[in-house]
């Protein structure tokens, strides 16, 4: 009887085949879209577990070619050509590695062979993309984490946090629209327009829209001034069609209202005479008529 009870108790502690298990380094994914460019990373997420320091020890030795994760190599994938840390990255999927050093820059490596185990780092090759990075100190992260902590209309920052170590690389994507415009291209639109709102609750409200050309950009502003848009970029999305781009306080465009808001100019004889502002469901939100 005692033997039967012992066998029954033992079976309680034997995991069933295929049952879920807690891993030392769980799989994590990170995905971010920036103006149509999708960046995806997949990686195992080691924990600190009281180990300090992490680098320059048997955990990650100096001059080691280390995958910033665990188990199978961390992967980086982009659906379009883009720039990472100043280096051009063709669209595709790569395994990611970092050469860690006691002083000076570290080196991020994107290798075209995706499926590699973390104990089998790649040899140096001409097909690799190498990006110098400077490790810094930041807030403590128990679990290794990849993220895009800040984003602009044309890029952002890719960052790894583990313990108090931060590795970050600037991201730049190819814009899907033309941000700049020459003076000759802008000339037909520059001027003042009587601007009349057509949708409730502002129906019939009038203001003046000023269209100018500054710093190789077509810009607009309303008088009285709109506290949110202030001075905004008019970004060409089709012939005579523009979407407003909103600036942050540093002068960088951080949001483009496409397709929520479209300025459609009517050009006759090389000069815009009027405009309509349409919503994404093609309703006329406002109209404008050129003033003398």
Which residue stretches match the model-derived regions?
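Positively charged n-region of N-terminal signal peptides that target proteins for export
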Residues: 1-4
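Bacterial N-terminal signal peptides
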Residues: 6-15
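Bacterial Sec-dependent signal peptides at the C-terminal "C-region" and cleavage site
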Residues: 15-23, 292
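Short N-terminal segments immediately surrounding and downstream of signal-peptide cleavage
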Residues: 21-40
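A short, compositionally biased
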Residues: 23-28, 76-78, 102-104, 152-156, ...
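Extended, well-structured beta-strand/loop surface patches
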Residues: 42-91, 97-188, 222, 288
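Peripheral terminal and inter-domain segments
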Residues: 131, 139-153, 160, 171-292
């Amino acid at each position: 009887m005692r033997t039967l009870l012992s066998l029954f108790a033992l079976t309680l502690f034997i995991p069933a085949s295929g049952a879920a298990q807690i891993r030392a380094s769980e799989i994590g994914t990170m995905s971010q879209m920036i103006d149509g460019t999708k960046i995806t990373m997949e990686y195992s997420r080691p924990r600190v577990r009281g180990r300090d320091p992490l680098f320059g020890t048997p955990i990650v030795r100096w001059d080691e070619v280390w995958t910033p994760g665990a188990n199978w190599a961390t992967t980086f994938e982009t659906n379009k050509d883009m720039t990472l840390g100043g280096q051009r990255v063709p669209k595709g999927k790569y395994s990611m590695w970092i050469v860690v050093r006691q002083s000076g820059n570290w080196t991020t490596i994107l290798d075209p062979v995706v499926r590699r185990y973390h104990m089998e780092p790649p040899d140096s090759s001409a097909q690799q993309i190498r990006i110098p990075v400077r490790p810094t100190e930041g807030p403590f992260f128990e679990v290794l984490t990849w993220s895009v902590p800040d984003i602009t209309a044309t890029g952002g920052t890719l960052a790894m946090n583990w313990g108090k170590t931060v590795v970050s690389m600037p991201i730049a994507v190819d814009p899907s629209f033309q941000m700049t415009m020459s003076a000759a291209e802008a000339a037909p639109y520059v001027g003042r327009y009587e601007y009349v709102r057509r949708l409730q609750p502002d129906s019939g409200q009038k203001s003046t829209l000023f269209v100018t050309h500054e710093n190789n950009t077509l810009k607009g502003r309303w008088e009285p001034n709109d506290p949110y848009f202030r001075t905004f970029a008019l970004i060409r999305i089709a012939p005579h069609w523009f979407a407003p781009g909103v600036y942050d306080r540093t002068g960088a465009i951080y949001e483009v209202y496409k397709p929520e808001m479209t300025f459609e100019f009517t050009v006759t004889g090389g000069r815009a005479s009027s405009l309509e502002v349409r919503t994404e469901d093609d309703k006329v939100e406002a109209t404008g008529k050129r003033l003398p």
